Amino acid sequence: MNSLENLILVGVIKSCHGIKGHVMLKSFTDPATKILERNLVNESGANIHIKLISQNAKGELICTFNDIATRNEAEHLKGYKIFCLRASLPELEEDEFYIADLTHLPVLNQDHKEIGKIKNILNFGAGDIIEIEFSDQTTELLPFNKEFFPIITKDYVILNYQREA
């Protein structure tokens, strides 16, 4: 069994597709098909076998999943999370990060005072957006760039941004 700390979420099954047990897979890799090059596991560390059938215009993958052969079986997989072992991932270049490593990091202001946490990282096609949950429980979306986040470490990020009062 693998600890979730040793796993990186690389995809999730969105829905079933067709009557033959195919599933629609949302891959978090870039490009989306890179997920197929990894040894994939579930939360318990059991191997997952995925075979690509096709890819739609949104980049979602239509796949076979393990031995699922019918739509009824595939319907139960909605929301199923797919992981790979952290150790199997390539080394990152400077200023590259895995989403899993940034999510929940403390956000500090320029005076190194904690003002919130990274709640989520989103991408709608025009670049990464950081969702910050501030200490007062409000959230804001900010572009993920050096102007807003000049310092990023494995333990915290510094935010260069003045919130409106």
Curated annotation (Swiss-Prot):
SUPFAM superfamilies for the chain: PRC-barrel domain (SSF50346), Translation proteins (SSF50447)
GO biological process: ribosomal small subunit biogenesis; rRNA processing
Subcellular localization(s) per the UniProt record: Cytoplasm
Major subcellular site: cytoplasm
Keyword Chaperone: yes
InterPro entries: PRC-brl_dom, PRC_barrel-like_sf, RimM, RimM_N, RimM_N_sf, Transl_B-barrel_sf
One of the record's GO cellular component terms: ribosome
Domain PRC barrel, first and last residues per copy: 94-165
This protein's UniProt keywords: Chaperone, Cytoplasm, Ribosome biogenesis, rRNA processing
GO molecular function list: ribosome binding
Entry's free-text remark on domains: The PRC barrel domain binds ribosomal protein uS19.
Subunit structure: Binds ribosomal protein uS19.
Function: An accessory protein needed during the final step in the assembly of 30S ribosomal subunit, possibly for assembly of the head region. Essential for efficient processing of 16S rRNA. May be needed both before and after RbfA during the maturation of 16S rRNA. It has affinity for free ribosomal 30S subunits but not for 70S ribosomes.
PANTHER family linked to this entry: RIBOSOME MATURATION FACTOR RIMM
NCBIfam families on file: 16S_RimM
Similarity-based family: Belongs to the RimM family.
Name recorded for this polypeptide: Ribosome maturation factor RimM
Species: Rickettsia rickettsii (strain Sheila Smith)
Organism placement in taxonomy: Bacteria, Pseudomonadati, Pseudomonadota, Alphaproteobacteria, Rickettsiales
The gene coding this protein: rimM
